[in-house]
Every structure is written in C-alpha cells, then in structure tokens.
C-alpha cells in the first residue's frame, strides 16, 4: 500500500561529531491515489497549478519502522481531521499533465521555492506563532490513468548549516537521563499543553525541568521562559524517528530557526526528541532521546540557505518512484473509473459544459432486445448509463448472434435463452457496474386479441400493469421492436406519464430515429389553455416551414398515419414478416437513437426543446453537442440523412388527447377494447373514420366537377 524508504535504516557511524538526521520516507495510501484520480478527472483536468495538500507523521511507531510522512485519501481536504496523536504537515502538490513534463520539471527551482517560504516564515517570526510552517513538503506527480501507473517524487525541504551541527553530548535514551518522576511529569505536561492548544500532538515546545517537575510551553512564549535556568535551554521536538542515536527530519528546520533567532545569545541547546509509543496498552516515552548540540552563530546572511530534501527512490538513487495500482485496486472500481475516463476527458477541453450526471443517471428502458436493442444498449454503456432494462418475449435463434452483439452461439442451444434475460446478463459481464435487468414478457398489441379465455385476459392485464410500472420507473423509453403495432401501447403509456420516448425503426436501407413529442404536465394543460397539445392558428405561425416547433407540439411515431395500427404480420410471407435490412443499418440507427437522447438531455428544456431541422445545420447549435432534431431519416443507398419535423396530429391513434383521455379514465378496459377490436375502433374514436369519409366525399365532388367540364 505505502511506498516506504529504507534509507534511514542505515545511518552513518554514531561516533561522528556532526549531527545526522534520519530522513522522512513517503507513505502514500491507495486511497490517496484514488482521490487524486477523481480530482484529476473531475476537477483539475488540465490545470497544473500547485494545490495545497496535507499529510501527517507519527512519533509512536514500533522499533524498526522508518520515519514516515503519510498521505491518505483526505490529503486534499486541508480541514479534514487526522488520526489522533499525529502531527500534521502541509505541502504542495504539482500534478503534471504529461510524463514528459514530469521528467523535465525544474526540481531545483521547486525546492528553492519551498525553501524560501520556510526561510521567510523564520525571518518574519511566523514560524514561532505557527511551528507547522517548518515542516513543509512538496509532491511532484504524474498519473497515467489508462494504466493506473502513478509516478511521484517527494521532497522534504530542509535548510542547511554551512558547516553542519556539532554534537556536544551524544544522544542517550530519556530513561537514562530522567528519573521516573521527571518522565511522568514530562508526559503530563505535554498532554496538558496539547489540551490547552486544542490538538493531540504538538510539533515543537520549550522545556524546563527540575528534580521532580517539568514545565513545557509553546515556542512563542520564549521570552522569559528560561530566566531561572541559568542559561540552559531545552527544546522538545515531536520526533517520528525510532533510531537510538539520530533525530528525525523535523529537527533540521527548527535548528535553523533557533540559530537565526537566538544564536547570538546561546552557545548550545539541549534537544529532547519526544517519542510516544504505546505497547500492549502501556504508554512509554522512555525511548525518547536527549542530547546537546553547539548552536552555530552568525551562520546566515539575508538570503535563504542552501536546501536539500528530494527523496531517494527504491534503488537508493536520486529519482522518482512509481506505483502500479492496476492489479491491487478493486477490478470493479477500476472498470468504473475506466468507463468514465473518456467521458470525463470530453469535459477537459472539447465540451466543458457537458453535464455527464444527466446522462449517467438516466434510467433507460429498452423495449426490444434484438438487433436495435443490442446496439442501443452498447452505446448507452459507452455513455456511462448505469441503469438499463430490457423487455422482450423472444428467444435467441441461430441467426441472431452475428447481427446482435450481446449474444453468442451457446445462447442459441436448447431452444435459445430468453433475449431480455440474456442481454441483461451479458451487460453485467461486460461491465459489472451496470444495473441491468431483463423481463421476458409480451406487449399486448392492437389487432391481436387477448380475449380467448380468462387466462389470456389475466395475462394481458398483468403484462400491461408490468409495462406501466416499468415506464413509470424509467426516464427514457426506447421503442426498438419489430412491428409497428407493438410500439402503440408503450407510446400511449409513455405519453400519459410524460416520459421521453426515443423511437428507432428500420427498412431495408432506410431508417427513422425520432423523439416523440413530450406532452406538457397535466396541471398546465388543464389550468391554462395555452398549453393545449392541439395546435391553434397562432401555434402554426411559422410552423409551415417546420421551424421553431417546441417539443410539446412534436408528433409521435403514429402521427403521420391515417389508419390505426393492426396485425401487420397476417398474410405475410417470411421476408415480409422478418426485418430484412442491410447489416450495418441497425448499428447506425441504434447509435443515432442514443446520441439523440444525449442531445435532448443536454438541452436546458430537455424533451420540450425546439426541434432542429435540416435548415438549421448552418445555424448556431442549441446545445454544446449540436442540434436537437425531431427526426433523423437515413438513406443508406445515398449515404444521406435528413432532419424533418412534424407536428402532433390531433387525430393520432397514440398521442391525441382523445386516446390519452380514454386511457387515463378507463385504463385496461379501454386497452382491451383496442386489443380485441379491429382498427376501426381507434379510427372511430380519434375521428379518422370521419376524415376518411370527408376525403372520399371530396374526391366524389372533384370527379363530378371533371365530368361536368
């Protein structure tokens, strides 16, 4: 999990007269890299400006552990709490966009910049008020989010004395210098200081001790604190190091502070490296070390001293480290992050205003799990949609797998698996993060009687109720069935429930993809006549050119029909019963159906968006993704598409006010009449029968006029 250096395990000879320090080792939790990934994708994007982050270090590790500076998932929230009895350290993150930038970055300049900030805090006295300013770090990173390889290089800036620091008294354990009473008094005094300051760990503090008493105080209370000590000065440092002869890295910058502030009045200073370990429930600070050093005088000018601090890599050389998380991260979370990667990259530069949440959170119901259904499902997954539900009553046949990419040869055996169930199962195998369900059920249709028996009527009632529940539970309904009449019932239910409907249908080398007009909310229709779905004279102003037609006045799949839907498979040959089309057509139409949905969702008015037509191709697009058409009609023989717009028909057999009113008032009783009757029932209800009669009468009058002439 954490990358830890072992270089502090091999210190120099303790007999050296100059003080040596055990450097920090970086310890980056997997949660840190996961959070960096999310920040990079969703927030930073191409931004390379420095970011403030927070880590912590601990002075209670068991013997043998290196001095670690830890960064967790909460490192990006500087106000987040850290574990108890740990000391915070603030740093700067430099996250680069490319590996080349990471390699060529001026490390010397970055170190000097951080060192100058520490030096300025020392000169200004800010470090006395806030000692945490002495423990800064910087982190240079590059995240390869395709492979989940993370390159990083830590730096712990430490200012240096020109001639080093000479040791007067070598480090010894606190238990060898202090009595038991003094140790207990020190522990109590330190706890009281932390409680007074409202923290659980304090990085630097002043100490004065007598035979049986110890007093500690913050650095800012230096003046007058040591007046009764006869020139003896002792300071405490919260020390993450475990070595018995060497202090940890946090002492370095403090000694620079001490030399700059008090070097002219002090010749030496006693240092207590405070280490606070709990073993088997017993707290122990006796392994802390205490020693005396000679404090250099006049060692600095106005300029920042030389600084060091770049961490060595695992091989012990000066270079970055790399961590490969592609294998240790949860495969499902990896899949989710990877699925979202390309989508979020769109927002970086190409489409900054793209609202991915609207797309990802859309719950999609696919009525039909055949050639169109498979293509639509795969494209929806490409857009990151997490909720996909299939409805189909067919089983997978041997002709299906080559045209329907969610199925395999094994799915055809033993009579074939139910398409809806197999499609839902396959989506979860492709991407475990998708919530896919399948319903193996029939959709009752006009002209297909269900009144053969009580059993068939009960089954039809159950199927209608299930379909109503499914449409109610989803945001977008895709009509992808083979026959025209099978689209009628879901078109009626979706229109009544004000759901967005995307329809796709195929010919041999032609297709139509369209969005149904989205009716205004019922309270607006009843409360204000201007929201009537039937277009009045003022509504049609300019509509003859099929421009500026709002979404609630757009027609549905049945609005261009002058006959009611019926049994289209009766008395048809095999080639007329099956959908015979060019193999690539379904993938084109399926992709366009999903892209139309996405464009509608990105429009501020959603399904009520004004329809774009072919005439709008040269105009300013209404969304960041371009046009929002009503229909897309494609002609593969000419490799051409057109974008027609049509108004809602007040005599439509699916979305007209008369049909919706009858459905909402009578429910299944009305639907049963449609299923069990001929097409004349819907035509009589909507006025199509009268329209036919008027048309025939007009033709008779025309013929009479011709004969007279």
Swiss-Prot record:
Query: Which keywords has UniProt assigned to this entry?
Result: Autophagy, Biological rhythms, Cytoplasm, Protein transport, Transport, Ubl conjugation pathway
Q: Which GO terms describe its biological process?
A: autophagosome assembly; autophagy; cellular response to nitrogen starvation; mitophagy; piecemeal microautophagy of the nucleus; protein modification by small protein conjugation; protein transport; regulation of circadian rhythm
Mind telling me which InterPro entries this protein's record contains?
A: Atg7, Atg7_N, Atg7_N_1, Atg7_N_2, ThiF/MoeB/HesA, ThiF_NAD_FAD-bd, Ubiquitin-activating_enz
Q: Where, by residue number, is the active site? A: 578 (glycyl thioester intermediate)
Indicate the segments annotated as coiled coil, or none if absent: none
GO annotations of cellular component type: cytoplasm; phagophore assembly site
Instruction: Please state the protein's primary subcellular location.
Output: cytoplasm
Q: Which GO terms describe its molecular function?
A: Atg12 activating enzyme activity; Atg8 activating enzyme activity
Q: Origin, by domain of life?
A: Eukaryota
Q: Which Pfam families match?
A: ATG7_N, ThiF
Q: Where in the cell is it found?
A: Cytoplasm; Preautophagosomal structure
Function comment = E1-like activating enzyme involved in the 2 ubiquitin-like systems required for cytoplasm to vacuole transport (Cvt) and autophagy. Activates ATG12 for its conjugation with ATG5 as well as the ATG8 family proteins for their conjugation with phosphatidylethanolamine. Both systems are needed for the ATG8 association to Cvt vesicles and autophagosomes membranes. Required for autophagic death induced by caspase-8 inhibition. Facilitates LC3-I lipidation with phosphatidylethanolamine to form LC3-II which is found on autophagosomal membranes.
**What's written under domain?**
The C-terminal part of the protein is essential for the dimerization and interaction with ATG3 and ATG12.
Family per UniProt? Belongs to the ATG7 family.
Spell out the subunit comment: Homodimer. Interacts with ATG3 and ATG12. The complex, composed of ATG3 and ATG7, plays a role in the conjugation of ATG12 to ATG5.
Name of the protein: Ubiquitin-like modifier-activating enzyme ATG7
The organism encoding this protein is: Gallus gallus
